[in-house]
């Protein structure tokens, strides 16, 4: 059931390409393990999440990888001009809210023999409308239920395109669950997304994900409708101009918008702490304050936040 919900959300042609794991780091390690050459030539944006940055830094340190990091604006051109084995990019950058719109350009470069393209959809899944139907046969997509899917921890997933990475070196016994009758010594793999499965894990997150999706379906709430509602709250907050000393990194344009507003300023950490003392929950990444609005808030909540900010 969870596979079907995810496939419908992303417009994937086949739910069986989806595998589950407690975290996306597992999938990064398994994908990397399936690349036969060393060092692996990796291209990524300079705004990737901590788990990717830490693991990649360690692989570079160990001589396992050569990393090229560029800004999101330079990613597509660099990918087209260079020779890489792995291209990794967030759909929505966690620290700035910028949205990468060149997914089709990156996908056009992907081949089973390399390069492979991995899209980190953690801030995109159920946060912005995402249609992978045209590129599903070429790209990996990783995400999870911890953010906008409202399913909590421990329910992450990977869409693995057919014919790419058929035999990850890092593997668990679930990856051969359909082939347990193989003779001793044979290492079999599922032919679908199950080839990226690990071993025994707590499946309760899948039940939470299913429950959330059923509830949203019953209420007629799609990602598009929720995003439109949140965008009204975001614009209401922006119009109030209650953070004049901060720069908004992700102003509204003509396309999709992240579910959070990213404000950059030297006092971001101090303001985060000050708001927390007033029971206003935001988060901070270095000098960037992220303010997220959701379905459970309304214009009155925005006005209260504006009042608190103006009174500081």
Roles of regions detected by a PLM:
Residues 1-39, 50:
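Conserved beta-loop-alpha segment that forms the PLP phosphate-binding cup at the N-terminus of a helix
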Residues 68, 72-126:
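Active-site phosphate-binding strand-loop segment of PLP-dependent enzymes
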Residues 113, 269, 273-312:
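PLP-dependent enzyme catalytic core of the Aspartate aminotransferase-like
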Residues 190-238:
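Structural signature of PLP-dependent enzymes
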Residues 227-278:
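Conserved PLP-binding catalytic core of the aspartate aminotransferase-like
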